């Protein structure tokens, strides 16, 4: 057994995900996409709105052919990237397409040509909340889930 704390990450958007991670032995969790869509997040409002509007099937992984996979929301840029990957485009052609694409999304709010990095849980996010609200709601939900399972773990 591992004697260091395990932090679960990926696919966690709410208290049920937190509770599941704890029930599997994690000592803590990390949520990425959930906080990208928070009120305090510095990403452009257009980016946040795309996450909030996303459905559970709206993310895609690009970069598998380069060894640098990135999950992001589907848009024109990801469609073009996947097309080029399917055609076995070389690394430099793929790099050229994505050069500056994260900045386009985060700073400029370009939801067509920017990389809208987001996990599969984007479809679970329905509104913009403060970080405090996200944490309090997540912990409360986790406590309820764990209590319903008859486990007593302090969160």
Please state what every model-predicted region is.
Residues 1-7, 13-155:
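Conserved active-site-proximal phosphate/metal-binding subdomains
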């Amino acid at each position: 057994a591992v004697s260091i704390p395990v932090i679960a990450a990926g696919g966690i958007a709410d208290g049920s995900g937190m509770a599941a991670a704890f029930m599997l032995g994690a000592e803590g969790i990390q949520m990425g996409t959930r906080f990208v869509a928070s009120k305090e997040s510095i990403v452009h409002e257009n980016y946040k709105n795309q996450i909030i509007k996303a459905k559970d099937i709206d993310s895609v992984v690009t970069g598998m052919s380069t060894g640098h996979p990135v999950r992001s929301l589907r848009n024109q840029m990801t469609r073009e990237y996947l097309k080029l990957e399917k055609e076995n485009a070389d690394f430099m052609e793929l790099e050229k397409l994505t050069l500056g694409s994260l900045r386009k999304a985060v700073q400029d709010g370009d939801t067509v040509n920017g990389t809208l990095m987001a996990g599969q849980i984007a479809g679970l996010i329905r509104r913009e909340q403060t970080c405090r609200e996200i944490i309090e709601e997540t912990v409360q939900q986790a406590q309820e889930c764990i209590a319903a399972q008859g486990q007593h773990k302090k969160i």
